[in-house]
Amino acid sequence: VLNYDPANPSNWNADQDIKKSPLWPYCGNSVGIWKCPADRSTVRPSSGPFAGQVVPRVRSMAMSIWVGGWKQNNGLVTDAGCSGPTWRVYSKLSDMADPGPTRTWVLMDEREDRINYGNAFTDMIGYPDAPSQWRFHYDYPGSYHNRACGFSFADGHAEIKKWRDDRTCPPIVLGGAWNAVEYVPSPRNPDIFWMQERSTRKK
């Protein structure tokens, strides 16, 4: 998990998590692809070779929880607030019949003050026709690029999505997490709908 704890090597040591990932053999030995250059978050480790130094955190990317699921729960997404059992978790390309690989995002930039685990949770509650229920889970997309965020999709293409709603882009809280509330209501937010459309479908 990524945070600002100086005793947590996951913040600054790529050997801790990134290089243990099943995706690492496909990364060209490049740690840098896991962090957006616009994310300038840092941490001061309390131990190890960088103890006492200010060093950059290693990651700003997160993977859709609907692609691969939640490791700590045998791949299942069972959060009641996200109607977990109702929605598909894609474990291989052939699972992605709907919405299809070109419409299923896999990785995105996440905000430095909200990123935690390696997954990003798009809350599906209210999709598609109950917009008064739409909300963010703890995970928020990045907005570093002039209120836009980078997404990569299952077919290999990438998109920069320009956000339309101010609620998607609150000011960054430097050096810490803002608003520890797990769910943040954002009714009728078109940006949430855009992510829901490209996340999963009902079983």
Where are these regions (language model features)?
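Short, well-structured segments within or immediately adjacent to enzyme catalytic domains
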Residues: V1-K203
